[in-house]
Amino acid sequence: MSFFQKNTSLFARLGYFISFVILLLLSLIGVEFFVGNGDGIWFDYDLRLIGFRLVAWAVSFVVLYLLIRNGPPLLQNVLLSLVSVLLVIYGVEVVVGWIHDASQKSTTSSLPQYAGPAYDSSYAFDEFLGRKPIPNHTFWWTKTLKGKPVVQIGMKADSFSRRITPFADSTHPKRDKYALFFGCSFTYGDAVKDNETIPYYFQKENADYQAYNYAFFGYSPRHALARLQHEDLTKQVSQKQGIAIYTYIEDHVNRAIPSAGWIGMYDGYFPDLDESTMKTTGVYRFVHPIKYRFGMMIFKSKVRQHFAMDFPFGYRPKDYELTANLIKASQEEYKKQFKNDNFYVVVYPDLLKKDSPMIGLLKERGLKVLDYRKLFPFPSKQYQLSYDSHPTPEAHRLLMEQLTKDLKKVGGVSGMTN
């Protein structure tokens, strides 16, 4: 007992705490090894990670205390100011969190509480894309009310993780052209059936084309570029001639940057980009762990959620430039693979971007741009799903009907101009 009485210094107490944490976690890990599967995770809690964090925080607090108490005056003042600022930020976050949670409860209490869809069951990990549709899999897009499905839609993916585009007329004898579609959930067809997507309606309007859907939930220009840089799509497409279409919405700028909101929404699982070479180099959360952690902190902030803020706070000229450069790089990669320049950017109707410079930037880079912003109002009740914020099948149909007309005006893909 005399040993513990003599060793009562701060460092000794820190050592006792660390030893206690290690012994406790070793005991829990030992129990989990015999009663669980031996992976160190018990009831979804990673015991090793918890132990590391406890020790790391304890050491950090002790070091901070010693520096404030015994450090030079300048360092003491800096650290005290920093701690004060952090405490104020934390206090504001807590208070705004209470207000936000209360307002959310009052807003939703009188509305039907729908659950789903469970997007986590729709994708698999990919070393360059971050996430991709599970190959040869049907994802059931389901919304439930009081535990019962109210909307249930099957979304089928093929062996190349492309959403299957069924033929409107399976008896057509010859489809000798391809149409590659890149984009986000608008193109993939969030909340609509396989025969209600953008690629489907294009294929229905153009019987000599076979459409291939390379889009997915939450995709961005980064994903289109990564797919073209790391996959040989000519080996996935049987036709030798055709076109590629990238469907653009203004939110793709968020994803190109990426903004803190988008880092959080996609949990950092999207392609990283070397802007100097325009090469995709892996998955963002693993290449930039510090930026990823910082982005997640902002994303989870109650202040950000309550005031609907993001970081950066608005689109900067360089953000638009980066987005345009990404789409241009995708066009160049497409041209390398398919040996033609039939790459078009379709600008989806979107009332939120009247002053966007994107169309001008794309045209400056020599891209073929089809501006459909005024084709129909979106978002609007007429063209927005009642059970989701995405476009209706009718909106997709109208868009592809207009695209078909524009292609026919110039005699097909070879003569299309921007």
Where are these regions (language model features)?
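Membrane/wall-proximal cationic-aromatic binding patches
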Residues: 100-200, 204-205, 376-379
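Internal/C-terminal transmembrane anchor helices
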Residues: 73-99
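Interaction-surface signature
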Residues: 102-125, 219-314
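Extended hydrophobic/aromatic segments used for targeting, binding, or gating
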Residues: 203-204, 212-217, 222, 351-393
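Membrane-embedded alpha-helical segments of integral membrane proteins
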Residues: 15-66
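Histidine-centered active-site loop/cap adjacent to the catalytic His
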Residues: 386-418
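N-terminal membrane topogenic signal
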Residues: 3-21
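Conserved, well-ordered alpha-helix/loop/beta-strand core segments that scaffold catalytic motifs
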Residues: 181, 240-253, 303-377
